[in-house]
C-alpha cells in the first residue's frame, strides 16, 4: 500500500475517517438517553443568576465546544444596564 | 411465524428502497410469502422501483384510516405471485400515520405473510420511528462513509430503545448491510473497510453489495435488481444476504463485476 502511495502521492484517508468516527461515536453514545445537557445547564444557570439580578431569559447563551483533549463551556449572559440596582432597590 | 423486518439507515440515499425491493423479490423467489410496505409517506418511491406505480389505488394511510380494506390496497407483483406491495401515500403528510393504526395494519399483515418488510423513510423522525416500531428484525443499510456510519449508529440506538421489542425487554435482531462498496477504493485506503464499519457499529454483517450500474438500470425499468439482472454482482450479493436472513450459513464474499485485463492493470473500476 505504501508503494502505491508513493506513486499516487496521496495518504490514505480511510484511517482518518475511522478515527474521527470512533471519537465522535464514543461521545454521542455516552450522551444517548440522557436529557439534553446544554438545555439543563442553561435552565439551572438561568435560575441561579436570576435570583440575584434581573435578566432577559432570551439573552442567556450556553455553548459547548468539544476539543480533542479539553472541552469548554461558554456562558454568555447579557445584563441590561442598571438591572442589578433595579433589583436591589426592588428587594 | 411471520417476521417483521425494517429496512432503515437514518441517512437518505444509501439504498433502503433498492434493498427492500431486492430482498423482497429474493425472499419471494425462495418461496416465502412477502409484502413490502412503503413508510415514506409523502415521498413514496417503492412503487416506482417495483414497477407498480400505475397500479396504486389505495395506500397505507387509507388502510390506517379505514378508508380502504387491506386487501384493496395490496398490489400483487406481476412477476412473482408471492410478492405484494403496500404503497405509501403521495399526498398526505407523515402525521397521517398513527402508532396504533400502524400496529393494527402490521398485525393484520402478520396473519397472511411470512415476511413484512418495512421500507423506512430517511431521518429519525416520526415516519422512521413508526417503520421500526413493530420490527422483529432490522437491516441497517450503511455506506462505507462517515455520515452514513454515524447515522447508522444513531438508528441502532433507536432500535435498542424505541421499538416495541426493546420496551418489552426483547431485542430486535439487527443486521448491517453495506451497500455501494468499492473494493478497489477500500484496498487503496480511500474508503472505510468492511472491518472498520463493523468494528465501529459492533453489529453483525448480513452482506456486502458492491457499487454497480445494475442497480440504476434496474430502478430505471422498475424491477428489483435481483429479478432484473440475477447474475449481476449486486443481485448475487442480495441473494446471499437473503439466504443468511433465512438462517443459512453462506460464506461472506464481495461479489465482483467481471473486469477486463486492461481495467485490472489500470486499476479502473469496472463499468
From Swiss-Prot, chain A:
InterPro entries: MinE (IPR005527), MinE_sf (IPR036707). HAMAP family: MinE. The gene is minE. GO terms for biological process: cell division; regulation of division septum assembly. Keywords: Cell cycle, Cell division. The keyword Cell cycle applies. Disulfide bonds: none annotated. It comes from the Bacteria. This is Cell division topological specificity factor. Prevents the cell division inhibition by proteins MinC and MinD at internal division sites while permitting inhibition at polar sites. This ensures cell division at the proper site by restricting the formation of a division septum at the midpoint of the long axis of the cell. Belongs to the MinE family.
